[in-house]
Amino acid sequence: MKLSMPRFDQAPVLVVGDVMLDRYWHGGTSRISPEAPVPVVKVDQIEDRPGGAANVALNIAALGAPASLVGVTGDDEAAESLTNSLKAAGVLARFQRIADQPTIVKLRVMSRHQQLLRIDFEEPFRTDPLALSAEVYSLLDGIKVLVLSDYGKGALKNHQALIQAARKRGIPVLADPKGKDFAIYRGASLITPNLSEFEAIVGHCVDEAQLVTKGAQLMQELDLGALLVTRGEHGMTLLRPDQQALHLPARAREVFDVTGAGDTVISTLAAAIAAGEELPHAVALANLAAGIVVGKLGTAAISAPELRRAIQREEGSERGVLGLEQLLLAVDDARAHKERIVFTNGCFDILHAGHVTYLEQARALGDRLIVAVNDDASVSRLKGPGRPINSVERRMAVLAGLGAVDWVISFPEGTPENLLTHVKPDVLVKGGDYGVDQVVGADIVQAYGGEVRVLGLVENSSTTAIVEKIRGQG
């Protein structure tokens, strides 16, 4: 399955559910308490992050999709912290505030990136389901997907009314279920239980075949459009009526913290479906996103640039021949890893030893080397009739096979100035015996603080000489 980045900016999503605040106390620990055999943590940083349904909305907004949120909080400092964080992220949050109940807070005590203790401040909310539903109904006409983020804390008490209201409007409903009564999600377009939640409903599954069988039965019983079971290190399994099961392996390179991974899955799914993606593609994107977020500490969101870079890696475009959009993503990724970008350009009509030596020297000036190649029409204008000898596709394919070259791109103009304006390399390199001020594009690179280098040519190595020799022998 070929992955691509959806147009999230045209994908409004509404999240309804249990809102909470994830609070982190960070500090160092170097001794054991004399009062009890527990570590003493000297807190030096306090951090608040939206959690639960608020984290789902935050993830959707981080992908670039318009996100709205309806939930329940107390009327307290934690609710203010949530409101401010969500507003800063561009989330439209509408909270039903309960004056005599606290906002749900999950407090984690952290030291050296390890969680030492979690303290929960919560009690089930006594909410007015009709008031909450009215808030949801007022927002339904402006959205493309409805998400029910259910943590069983009391915000969601009228699942069926919300599902039916959305279905009447043709709006898909995605639910992240909790509890032992999945009947409340009847008629949903997709539910996303993890394996333990799924098995709590259908019983233990001895293998994938049994998981598929029991999942199909559950979909039929609950009139579900689809079922996605998230299975940790075993990936995900997507089930749809009358279609073959789709198993996706886990994508995490390193698992650092699984907090909020389920939120990332349903938020990416919702945004992708709202953007018009087919369900298998949306699930593949969600699987990719989950693999990224578990590599972060604590409740975290995945950004659009992070997902784009992951798609690029998945599609094998970390190296090779790229278009401009792909190249800019690759450059952004390299810069995120503090890599130095080197740029050179030329016709490279017949690749010879001089070219190889020159490109190796250019690559040694940084971490990544971009080679921009004149297209065929451009070469013909520069070199005259009969050139190029090799088409631009062949020239780029040969260059991409060199160990010194990371990315190859073609350009139609006589000079690479347009590319330089977009890419902004750290180093612009040319081969020749002229001064830096004579290098085309030097002024562009130097204007933003980049470096321009001129490398000497290898003697007795010339494409023109090779072409003339071949023609003379012909």
UniProtKB/Swiss-Prot annotation:
Domain of life per record: Bacteria
Main enzyme class: transferase
EC id: 2.7.1.167, 2.7.7.70
Nucleotidyltransferase found in the keyword field: yes
Enzyme active site: D263
One GO term (biological process): ADP-L-glycero-beta-D-manno-heptose biosynthetic process
Annotated region (Cytidylyltransferase), positions in chain: 343-474
A molecular-function term among this protein's GO annotations: heptose 7-phosphate kinase activity
Residues covered by region (Ribokinase): 1-318
Reactions this protein catalyses: D-glycero-beta-D-manno-heptose 7-phosphate + ATP = D-glycero-beta-D-manno-heptose 1,7-bisphosphate + ADP + H(+); D-glycero-beta-D-manno-heptose 1-phosphate + ATP + H(+) = ADP-D-glycero-beta-D-manno-heptose + diphosphate
Pathway: Nucleotide-sugar biosynthesis; ADP-L-glycero-beta-D-manno-heptose biosynthesis; ADP-L-glycero-beta-D-manno-heptose from D-glycero-beta-D-manno-heptose 7-phosphate: step 1/4; Nucleotide-sugar biosynthesis; ADP-L-glycero-beta-D-manno-heptose biosynthesis; ADP-L-glycero-beta-D-manno-heptose from D-glycero-beta-D-manno-heptose 7-phosphate: step 3/4
Sequence similarity: In the N-terminal section; belongs to the carbohydrate kinase PfkB family. In the C-terminal section; belongs to the cytidylyltransferase family.
Function: Catalyzes the ADP transfer from ATP to D-glycero-beta-D-manno-heptose 1-phosphate, yielding ADP-D-glycero-beta-D-manno-heptose.
Assembly: Homodimer.
HAMAP family linked to this entry: HldE
Name under which the protein is recorded: Bifunctional protein HldE
